[in-house]
Swiss-Prot record:
It catalyses: 2-(N(omega)-L-arginino)succinate = fumarate + L-arginine. GO terms for molecular function: argininosuccinate lyase activity. Keywords: Amino-acid biosynthesis, Arginine biosynthesis, Cytoplasm, Lyase. Pathway: Amino-acid biosynthesis; L-arginine biosynthesis; L-arginine from L-ornithine and carbamoyl phosphate: step 3/3. Coiled coil: none annotated. SUPFAM superfamilies: L-aspartase-like. It comes from Haemophilus ducreyi (strain 35000HP / ATCC 700724). GO terms for biological process: arginine biosynthetic process via ornithine; L-arginine biosynthetic process. GO terms for cellular component: cytosol. InterPro entries: Arg_succ_lyase_C (IPR029419), Argininosuccinate_lyase (IPR009049), Fumarase/histidase_N (IPR024083), Fumarate_lyase_CS (IPR020557), Fumarate_lyase_fam (IPR000362), Fumarate_lyase_N (IPR022761), L-Aspartase-like (IPR008948). It comes from the Bacteria. This is Argininosuccinate lyase. Pfam families: ASL_C2, Lyase_1.
Length: 458
């Protein structure tokens, strides 16, 4: 039975019922809906709507219902209820009879669903932050194992300056740390309880909403009933956090796809996270990484979709808001899966240290060091930059790396270049010179790893 049937003389069309019903996706809110109902039962008992005995009976029934479905809430999908609120109420009435019909006194599905979604989001934030931490741990461990692994760093997908694979790992650690703190910030703004605001104008009963908020583990009650039932900022923030993080994960995946390719051969991904071709028996495809990269689009789409849904809505609640759920459910599930898969990808990664070192020695990635060498000899940087550019052109024509040029050849471009130039052109020297905080100097990278380990352990 619908919760709103008294006003209507005809049954809803079956097509409309399917179009309108939301149980097939909002069943995920079952535990939150039950917990919110327990809190509401206590709140209306405090103002005399229920007796203590009635409250105890309702709470016991709700707890029993929770225990029945918690192992597998998908069993709810066998039911034909309109939404999760209708389902919980109908099951409660089955257990306690007409007493169950009293529970909704003073409550609207508008403040009820706003509560459910905030409670659900809070749970997801905790899960997602743990997934981020797991990936960070794996990145730090991989970095620690590869502090001596020198590889080319890229700009414009061209070899630019040598870095270490450890430094690359720590770059993504930092991105994920920002993802983690974005969730922490969003979580704080989820800590306001909308229950007790009714449909839009507040409750007709003297509900102690501050106590209700505490009972439901919120910091405070919301301050404006109209805003409370209309607000979906917490969903937008969670989707925005997911989208930014998926950008990071997509770039991480793209780097690994490139590093794994035959053209780079910097590393090999495990058989556990790759697949083959139905036609070409030699293929080993980086499907895990490609799917992470591809799934970013559906998360971005969920954010774009909800922004578009909300942008023209008048206050307060409109049925359009039902469209907030499928996108957020899918986006959060996708984000979590991608975080877990990225962690798995790193577990058995095999870095080819010989190949990465060879690649770092190619492409004149030590040219900047030669420019800095000239600056140290008193040449203005802009002039030094030009001199090195001409030197690189010559080296390319001679098919030699810079370090293979003779002193005589170097002196064609400036007389200050001498035998001491060779020491600064070596790969270890290139890394050692970048000793400012955040640079690729091995001691700085080790320091960053230690700081990260301490942070993750705290």
């Amino acid at each position: 039975m619908a919760l709103w049937g008294g006003r209507f003389q005809q049954e809803a069309d079956a097509k409309f019922k399917f179009f309108n019903d939301s149980l097939r996706f909002d069943y995920r809110l079952a535990l939150q809906d039950i917990d919110g109902s327990i809190g509401w039962a206590k709140a209306i008992t405090a103002v005399g709507i229920l007796t203590e005995a009635e409250c105890a009976k309702l709470v016991d029934a709700l707890k029993t219902l929770r225990a029945e479905i918690e192992p597998n809430i998908a069993i709810i999908l066998r039911d034909a209820a309109e939404d999760i609120h209708s389902w919980v109420e109908s099951k409660l009435i089955e257990k306690v009879g007409d007493l169950g019909k009293k529970l909704h006194t003073g409550r609207s599905r508008n403040d009820q669903v706003a509560l459910d979604m905030k409670m659900w989001c809070k749970v997801q934030v905790i899960v997602l932050q743990q997934c981020i931490r797991n990936l960070q741990h794996k990145l730090v461990a991989t970095a620690e194992d590869n502090q001596q692994t020198i590889m080319p760093g890229y700009t414009h997908l061209q070899r630019a300056q040598p870095i270490s694979f450890a430094h690359w790992c720590m770059a993504y650690y930092e991105m994920l740390e920002r993802d983690y703190t974005r969730l922490t910030d969003a979580y704080q703004r989820m800590h306001t309880c909308p229950l007790g605001c009714g449909a839009l104008a507040g409750s007709a009963y003297p509900i102690d909403r501050d106590q209700l908020a505490q009972d439901l583990h919120f910091e405070i009650a919301t301050r404006n009933s109209l805003d409370s039932v209309s607000d979906r900022d917490h969903l937008l923030e969670l989707l925005a956090s997911a989208s930014i993080s998926m950008v990071h994960l997509s770039r991480f995946a793209e780097d690994l796809i490139f590093f794994n390719s035959g053209e780079s051969a910097f590393l090999e991904l495990s058989d556990r996270v790759t697949s083959g071709s139905s036609l070409m028996p030699q293929k080993k495809n980086p499907d895990a990484c490609e799917l992470i990269r591809g799934k970013s689009g559906r998360v971005f789409g969920a954010l774009s979709g909800l922004l578009t849904t909300l942008k023209g809505l008048p206050l307060a609640y409109n049925k359009d808001m039902q469209e907030d759920k499928e996108g957020i459910f899918d986006a959060v599930e996708t984000w979590q899966a991608c975080l877990e898969m990225a962690t798995l990808v790193l577990e058995d990664i095999n870095v080819n240290v010989v190949r990465t070192s060879e690649a770092a020695q190619q492409g004149y990635s030590n040219a900047t060091e030669l420019a800095d060498y000239l600056v140290a000899k008193g040449i203005p940087f802009r002039e030094a930059h030009h001199i090195v550019g001409e030197t690189v052109v010559y080296a390319i024509q001679q098919r030699k790396p810079l370090e293979a040029l003779s002193v005589t050849e170097f002196k064609q471009f400036h007389s200050v270049i001498d035998q001491d130039v060779y020491a600064i052109l070596s790969l270890p020297s290139c890394l050692a010179k970048r000793s400012a905080k955040g640079g690729v100097n091995p001691s700085r990278v080790k320091e960053a790893i230690e700081v990260a380990k301490q942070h993750l352990a705290s």
